[in-house]
Curated annotation (Swiss-Prot):
All residue ranges annotated as the Sm domain in the record: 8-68
InterPro entries in the cross-refs: Hfq, LSM_dom_sf, Sm
Domain of life, per lineage: Bacteria
Organism: Bacillus subtilis (strain 168)
PANTHER family documented for this protein: RNA-BINDING PROTEIN HFQ (PTHR34772:SF1)
Keywords: RNA-binding, Stress response
Alphabetized GO MF terms: RNA binding
Biological role stated in the UniProt entry: RNA chaperone that binds small regulatory RNA (sRNAs) and mRNAs to facilitate mRNA translational regulation in response to envelope stress, environmental stress and changes in metabolite concentrations. Also binds with high specificity to tRNAs.
Gene Ontology biological process terms in this record: regulation of DNA-templated transcription; regulation of RNA stability; regulation of translation, ncRNA-mediated
GO CC term, one of those recorded: cytosol
Quaternary structure and partners: Homohexamer.
Protein name: RNA-binding protein Hfq
Length: 73
């Protein structure tokens, strides 16, 4: 049985559904936008037509505007 990767499932779901999300960084700064892509180290966030590439090690929390349905089986 393959281990569940909740992080990838969560990010992929908010990406596919174009869910608006608030990203809290470790320094307390907040970014708002939509996740357009991600890999093992970064998240691409788009807000008001501008893109920001954020390193995951700088992120504390993702807070989506609506609940995300994950398949944990």
């Amino acid at each position: 049985m393959k281990p569940i990767n909740i992080q990838d499932q969560f990010l992929n779901q908010i990406r596919k559904e174009n869910t608006y999300v608030t990203v809290f960084l470790l320094n307390g700064f907040q970014l708002r936008g939509q996740v357009k892509g991600f890999d093992n180290f970064t998240v691409l966030l788009e807000s008001e037509g501008k893109q920001q590439l954020i390193y995951k090690h700088a992120i504390s929390t993702f807070a989506p505007q609506k609940n995300v349905q994950l398949e944990l089986e």
